[in-house]
């Protein structure tokens, strides 16, 4: 069902050259990206949108979407959904899809941003609470944007390439950030590819990806994502999982700077640095680091105050997640070994040796705590080690202390640990819920610690 949006309209293609034929220099630049495609071949592109953006694509009385269909002789649809996400589907040849995207991107909302005197003086606010900024207020196309491409899970390998070579090449050649999420969208075989950068670069990257996957047949069962089945507890790369409403930026992508998306130092494949940990201090259930370890008094300075509690050292004999019914570490739960009842994390860290503290604070030998894991969640080669999966079990009445209101707590744990975390619904007649954690060993250990800490802090307070 197509809804009306009275204010957003596309620029006139005939009067605004920016959205008509591309200038010659742009065409020359694109010659650097060689593509052996049949330009007349019809392909389908599916983009995951926020529901609030659907109206901008559709337009008042369907004006915008009808113009796209007519002007480009393409199939364009944005089916209705009851959740916070909708899917933009475009069927046309690849070059035409690129032109349509360039016309749509400036109308999309950037995200939530708290109003400021500067913002309110430049933009008309419908509400004094929050304002949704629009890419359209930028001049030209010199701004950063992002799109979420949906692909069948069997096509992911063609984008990643052997040992990540293809995705690295895509990042470098198109100067974009690319994240391919491990977990499929709820009740589907689709995975999200998150692409960020300048609009022209993002579009070019999508065109190359379409060319890659159009040459590969889908393997196995195909169940396209239906946004009506969106699930807050899944970490699939959707807006509910990625968006940080306080800052209006997607978690894992950096704030915009003069040079576009910030890059990590050479040798990291051109991936972006994650947002500063300080942005999340006021949400963290952990209020600062533990006291400095013996012989490392320098950690007590101002720099250390911005560090979180470190992840635990390697397990001393089993899984870190073991709860009693009150949500505190117990001897065993469901056959999993944890800390004994008198050895909680509070007491355990007091016994750490200086080498354990150093390992916890400097997991990669650098100074301070390394957050590169958080920015690389779900993308190949960003994780610093082999990907493994583990499962832990908790009483179902403790799940709320982990998930939090609107899923905020589990979102934060995912972000801070860098791991993919999925909480299954309890089986019929069962009193337990299974938590599946995927990531590197360090990420899994950190996630387990954060999950345990969340239960310890909130189970009694919130009456679970």
From Swiss-Prot:
Sequence repeats lie at residues 54-76, 59-62, 245-250, 257-260, 267-270, 295-298, 324-329, 399-421, 404-407. Residues 42-104, 144-209, 387-451 form the KH domain. It comes from the Eukaryota. One of its GO terms (cellular component) is chromatin. Residues 59-407 are annotated as: 5 X 4 AA repeats of G-X-G-G. Sumoylated by CBX4. Sumoylation is increased upon DNA damage, such as that produced by doxorubicin, etoposide, UV light and camptothecin, due to enhanced CBX4 phosphorylation by HIPK2 under these conditions. Ubiquitinated by MDM2. Doxorubicin treatment does not affect monoubiquitination, but slightly decreases HNRNPK poly-ubiquitination. Residues 245-329 are annotated as: 2 X 6 AA approximate repeats. SUPFAM superfamilies: Eukaryotic type KH-domain (KH-domain type I) (SSF54791). This is Heterogeneous nuclear ribonucleoprotein K. It comes from Bos taurus (Bovine).
């Amino acid at each position: 069902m197509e809804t009306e949006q009275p204010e957003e309209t596309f620029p006139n293609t005939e009067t605004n050259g920016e959205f008509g034929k591309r200038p010659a220099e742009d065409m020359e630049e694109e010659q650097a990206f060689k593509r052996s495609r049949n330009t007349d071949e019809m392909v389908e592109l599916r983009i995951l949108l926020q529901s609030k953006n659907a109206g901008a694509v559709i337009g008042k009385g369907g004006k915008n979407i009808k113009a796209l269909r007519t002007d480009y002789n393409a199939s364009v649809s944005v089916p209705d959904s009851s959740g916070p996400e909708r899917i933009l589907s475009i069927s046309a040849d690849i070059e035409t899809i690129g032109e349509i995207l360039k016309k749509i991107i400036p109308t999309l909302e950037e995200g939530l941003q708290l109003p400021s005197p500067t913002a309110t003086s430049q933009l008309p606010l419908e509400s004094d609470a929050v304002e949704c900024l629009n890419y359209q207020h930028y001049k030209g196309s010199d701004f950063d944007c992002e799109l979420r491409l949906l692909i069948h899970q069997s096509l992911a390998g063609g984008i990643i390439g052997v040992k990540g070579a293809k995705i690295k090449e895509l990042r470098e050649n198109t100067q974009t950030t690319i994240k391919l999420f491990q977990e499929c969208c709820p009740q589907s075989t689709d995975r999200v590819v998150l692409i960020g950068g300048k609009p022209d670069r993002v579009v070019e990257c999508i065109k190359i990806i379409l060319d890659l996957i159009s040459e590969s047949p889908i393997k196995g069962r195909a169940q396209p994502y239906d946004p009506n089945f969106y699930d807050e507890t899944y970490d699939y790369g959707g807006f509910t999982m990625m968006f940080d409403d306080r800052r209006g930026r997607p978690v894992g992508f950096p704030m915009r700077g003069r040079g576009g998306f910030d890059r990590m130092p050479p040798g990291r494949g051109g991936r972006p640095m994650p947002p500063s940990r300080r942005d999340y201090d006021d949400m963290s259930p952990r209020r600062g680091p533990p006291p400095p370890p013996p012989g490392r008094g320098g950690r007590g300075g101002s720099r250390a105050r911005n560090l979180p509690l470190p992840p635990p050292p390697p397990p001393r004999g089993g899984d870190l997640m073991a709860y009693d019914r009150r949500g505190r570490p117990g001897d065993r739960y469901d056959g999993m070994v944890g800390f004994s009842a008198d050895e909680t994390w509070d007491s355990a860290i007091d016994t750490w040796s200086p080498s354990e503290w150093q390992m916890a604070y400097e997991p990669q030998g650098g100074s301070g705590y390394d957050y590169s894991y958080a920015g690389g969640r779900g993308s190949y080669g960003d994780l610093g080690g082999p990907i493994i999966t583990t499962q832990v079990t908790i009483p179902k009445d403790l799940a709320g202390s982990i998930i939090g209101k609107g899923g905020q707590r589990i979102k934060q744990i995912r972000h801070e640990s860098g791991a993919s975390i999925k909480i299954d619904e309890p089986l019929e007649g069962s009193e337990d819920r299974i938590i599946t954690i995927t990531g590197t060993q360090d990420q899994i250990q950190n996630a387990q610690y954060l999950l345990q800490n969340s239960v310890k802090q909130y189970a009694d307070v919130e009456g679970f």
